[in-house]
Amino acid sequence: MDVPALVEQAREGRPRAVARLISLVEGASPQLREVMAALAPLTGGAYVVGLTGAPGVGKSTSTSALVGAYRTAGRRVGVLAVDPSSPFSGGALLGDRVRMSEHASDPGVYIRSMATRGHLGGLAWAAPQAIRVLDAAGCDVILVETVGVGQSEVEIAAQADTSVVLLAPGRGDGIQAAKAGILEIGDVYVVNKADRDGADATARELNHMLSLGESRAAGDWRPPIVKTVAARGEGIDEVVEALDKHRAWMEKHGVLAERRRARASHEIETIAVTALRERIGDLAGDQRLSALAAKVADGELDPYTASDELVAGLTGR
């Protein structure tokens, strides 16, 4: 496969090329390294927004509404909808365009579902690479919608420039969000389904929780709370405005560059740990491991020292 040609086609906005590149990184193709090397100098221009929240708060509807708002403003949009994996096929349960079919024919929108494959953080393990593909393909904004199953969703903060936490009235979402720890990661909070009873109370509860223990210095970002009815498009422009303000604030204070460096560090660590696991997995039956195991079993060596020796042998340190 001609990777440079495929990357060039993706830069031109050809959906099939984008899809092929994402499939290559998602499937851990032997050409993965070549693909990532070709993409690296083409990335950094897209604004990555993560959307998370409990099931039923309207994440998909909100994502679709945001896509519409960004397209009206002339921005190219990429969407990664991270879905639960099917225990039978290992694929995403929901199709790429099932929930956002109104945008399927828009050449300025690329939508892709990715399976979590059991990853505890809710994000597909290949999501960071897929974000790079969409970035290189010229997307101005990339929306990453995660599974939303509780505490594990905190990982979205490691992948997004801005994290949006969605809640809905009458669900005790404020309390649940506090328990799950996602109140600590939100840059913008959205109370969706605001036409229902209890929306104002939910917003007040959320505001109270955010203010508890708050000790922000002058000029620090204070997460806004926006009420929406995404199904009717109400409040979506206000969400976009809040996102634009947060991006401007981050750029002014150097926070955006700092977050992206942290994201790159997290990605490097993940790749390195995965590589070490694979090398350790290859040691089954290896004489070094067998010899160390025998010493530990005989009480000649403790398992921590044995582990240090094993790692030193793998890394050459």
What kind of region is each of these model predictions?
Residues D2-V49, A54-V57, T63-S152, I156-G174:
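Nucleotide-state-sensitive switch-loop elements of NTP-binding domains
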Residues K227-A230, E238-T315:
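Long, well-ordered amphipathic alpha-helical subdomains in the mid-to-C-terminal portions
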Residues V188, A194-W249:
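Canonical P-loop GTPase G-domain recognition
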Residues P169-D197:
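Flexible active-site lid/hinge loop adjacent to a nucleotide/diphosphate
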Residues L93, A130, E155, Q159, ...:
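Alpha-helical scaffold elements adjacent to nucleotide-binding pockets in ATP/GTP-utilizing enzyme cores
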Residues P4-V7, M114, Y189-V191, P224-V229, ...:
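Short hinge/gating elements
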Residues L80, L166, V191-N192, T228:
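Generic beta-sheet signal
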Residues E12, S23-P30, P41, T72, ...:
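Generic secondary-structure signature for well-ordered alpha-helical cores
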